[in-house]
A protein has these predicted regions:
Chain A
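Terminal low-complexity/charged segments
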Residues: 1-171
Length: 171, 359
C-alpha cells in the first residue's frame, strides 16, 4: 500500500515541478519509505508544498545549514508515514514561505529566518520566535552569553519589561 | 470592556517559563499571544562542537522527561549513516527503556492535571503510583530521569532473569493502582467538570497544524510513529494506537491513560520475549559522510532528527524537532473561548516541554 502511495506522490511531484531536480527514494529494513528530492529552482518548493497539501500531508521540520558561502534548506515533509526530504540551495539568501500553503511550516520558517538570517517572502507572521529583538538575526554560530540570549535575562527584568509595555498600552 | 492580563513564570497560574498575553472579555478569553525564548540555550549549535559519543550525553540532557528519546533517535540517525545493524535484543531493550519512560512521563502530566484542577488527593495518588516506575528506572538504569540506555550500535544495559522478574512484579503492583486511578480521571464529576468540552482542538485544525502525539490522537488523528514508520522492535511488538474523538482536555487525558495501559502491556511483552544476542557491537564504528533522518514516538509525540556528517568526528549539521514545537500553535485554537481559569489546564493538556522546544 505504501509502495502505491509512493508511486503516486512521485508521479505528482514530477508533474508539478517546473525546473530541474534530482529524485531518489530509499526503503529501510522495516519497510519505511523516504524520498529525497533536490530542487534546482527554489521557486519549485511552492509546487512541492502544494502536492503535500493535496495528499493531506504536513511539514515536519525544515533544517537549515551553511555550505561554503550560501545556505541550504532541507524540508522534511510527511504524507502518512512517508517522509519527503527536499533540498534547496539558496544562492540569494531568499526563499518563498510555504506557510500560506502548509500551516505546519509556520514556526520552523520563523526559526531559520531568526537563526540564519534567511529572507522569507510571504510569511503571514514573520515575528521573532525565540530570541530577543535586540539580538541581530543570523546569530546561530556566534558566541553570546546565556543571560543576554534569553529573552528575559532574569525574571525581574522580564517583569519590568512587561509592566512598562502594559503602561504604554494604557496611555 | 476588555482586560489584558499576563500569565507566565511570574504568575501563580503557571510554573513554565512562557509568557501568555491574554485578552479577556469578562471571564472569557478572546485572544491569546504567546512569547517564548526565556530558556533558549543554543544546544543545536553546541551539538556541532561535540563528537558523536559526546553528543549521546548532550542529547540526553535536552529535556528530562523525553530524555530517553533524544539519544535514541540520534543514535538511529548515526547508525543509518554508518550502516550499522543493531541486534534484535538491543532493539527490544530500546523499546523497554522507551515504554518505561512513556508510562512515567504520562503519569507525571496526568498528576499535573489533577494539581491544576485543585484535586490534590488525586495528584498525590497518581504521583505515588508513578513512584513504582521511578523505582524501576532507578533499579535498572541507576537513575530516576536520565537513563542513558542507548549508545551507538546498541544499548548500554542488559536484563538478567532477576531483573526481568523484578520489573514484572512491580508492573503487577502498578496495574491495579492504575485501573483504580483511571476510573477517577474518566468518571469523577470534578475532573469531568474541568475537562469535558474544555480546550477543544477540532480534527481539521489538528491536521492543518500538524500536531503530534496524544494531542493529535485526542482529536482523532493517527500519526503515531511507532505504527506509521516503525523502528527498533515496534514492527514485531504491534502497538495498538489509542484514538479519541472529543478533541478536548478530557479526550487527551483519556488517550494518555489508555496509553499507560498499552505501554505496560508492551513492556511485559518485550521482556518476556527478549531475544538472545549481544546488546552492543564490540568495535567502535567509523561514521562516514552522509545524511539521515530518523523519527521516534516520544511521550509527547513525534521526535525527528536530521543528521549530516562529512566523515569527521563531529556532525556537520544536527537538527531536531520535538513534539511541543508543533503542538504550541494549537493552543491558539484551544484557548480562546474558554474561561481564564482553564488556561493553565489547557496548556498542560498538550504536555508542554519548553526546554525541548527552545533547546
Amino acid at each position: 500500500m505504501k509502495e502505491t502511495l509512493k508511486q503516486k506522490i512521485i508521479a505528482e511531484l514530477k508533474n508539478r515541478i517546473t525546473g530541474d531536480f534530482d529524485l531518489r527514494d530509499e526503503k529501510d529494513a522495516k519497510g519505511n519509505i523516504q524520498i529525497w528530492l533536490k530542487l534546482f529552482n527554489r521557486k519549485d518548493i511552492l509546487h512541492v508544498a502544494q502536492v503535500i497539501k493535496d495528499f493531506g500531508g504536513r511539514c515536519v521540520i525544515i533544517s537549515a545549514y551553511k555550505k561554503d558561502d550560501h545556505h541550504v534548506l532541507v524540508y522534511h515533509l510527511d504524507i502518512d508515514g512517508i517522509l519527503i526530504n527536499v533540498e534547496v540551495e539558496l544562492f540569494d539568501n531568499t526563499v518563498d514561505s510555504i506557510t500560506p500553503i502548509l500551516d505546519s511550516a509556520n514556526w520552523t520558517e520563523r526559526e531559520f529566518k531568526e537563526m540564519f538570517g534567511i529572507k522569507l517572502v510571504g510569511h503571514p507572521n514573520p515575528k521573532r520566535l525565540f530570541l530577543d529583538e535586540s539580538i541581530a538575526e543570523g546569530i546561530l554560530g556566534e558566541y553570546m552569553p546565556l543571560s543576554q540570549a534569553m529573552n528575559g535575562a532574569a525574571t525581574c527584568c522580564m517583569w519590568e519589561k512587561i509592566e512598562s509595555e502594559r503602561h504604554k498600552n494604557e496611555h | 470592556m476588555s482586560t489584558k492580563i499576563p500569565i507566565g513564570p511570574f504568575h501563580i497560574g503557571l510554573e513554565e517559563p512562557i509568557y501568555f498575553k491574554i485578552d479577556l472579555e469578562g471571564e472569557t478569553v478572546k485572544n491569546v499571544d504567546m512569547i517564548n525564548g526565556f530558556v533558549h540555550r543554543g544546544i543545536e549549535y553546541l551539538a556541532m562542537q561535540k563528537n558523536f559519543f559526546q553528543n549521546l550525553i548532550l542529547t540526553e540532557r535536552v529535556c528530562s522527561l523525553c530524555s530517553n528519546n533524544h539519544p535514541f533517535t540520534y543514535v538511529m540517525a548515526v547508525e543509518k549513516i554508518a550502516g550499522i545493524e543493531v541486534s534484535r535484543r538491543a532493539n527490544y531493550l530500546r523499546v523497554v527503556a522507551d515504554e518505561v519512560k512513556r508510562i512515567a512521563s504520562h503519569m507525571f502530566n496526568l498528576s499535573m492535571l489533577a494539581h491544576l484542577i485543585g484535586f490534590h488527593s488525586l495528584m498525590t495518588q497518581t504521583m505515588e503510583a508513578r513512584e513504582i516506575m521511578q523505582d524501576i528506572k532507578e533499579s535498572i538504569w541507576g537513575n530516576r530521569m536520565d537513563m542513558s540506555a542507548n549508545t551507538i550500535s546498541g544499548v548500554k544495559y542488559d536484563l538478567d532473569e532477576g531483573q526481568i522478574e523484578y520489573i514484572l512484579k512491580r508492573l503487577d503492583e502498578l496495574e491495579p493502582q492504575v485501573d483504580e486511578i483511571i476510573d477517577i480521571y474518566f468518571n469523577h464529576k470534578i475532573v469531568k467538570a474541568r475537562t469535558v468540552g474544555v480546550g477543544v482542538l477540532p480534527k481539521e485544525d489538528a491536521l492543518r497544524l500538524g500536531v503530534t502525539g496524544p494531542t493529535a490522537r485526542g482529536s482523532g488523528v493517527n500519526n503515531d510513529v511507532r505504527v506509521k514508520a516503525p523502528y527498533a522492535a515496534y514492527d514485531e511488538l504491534k502497538v495498538n494506537v489509542i484514538l479519541e474523538e472529543g478533541g478536548d482536555v478530557h479526550a487527551r487525558t483519556k488517550v494518555r491513560w489508555r496509553e499507560v495501559k498499552e505501554s505496560i502491556r508492551l513492556v511485559r511483552e518485550a521482556i518476556t520475549n527478549l531475544p538472545e544476542g549481544p546488546v552492543v557491537l564490540d568495535k567502535r564504528p567509523h561514521i562516514p559522510a552522509g545524511e539521515a533522518v530518523t523519527r521516534s514516538e516520544a511521550p509527547r509525540g513525534e521526535l525527528i532528527y536530521y543528521l549530516k556528517t562529512n566523515g569527521a568526528q563531529k556532525p556537520e549539521r544536527m537538527r531536531w524537532r520535538v513534539p511541543t514545537y508543533m503542538n504550541w500553535e494549537a493552543l491558539r485554537v484551544m484557548i480562546p473561548g474558554n474561561k481564564l481559569s482553564d488556561v493553565a489546564v489547557i496548556f498542560n493538556s498538550i504536555d508542554p516541554c519548553i526546554s525541548c522546544t527552545e533547546r
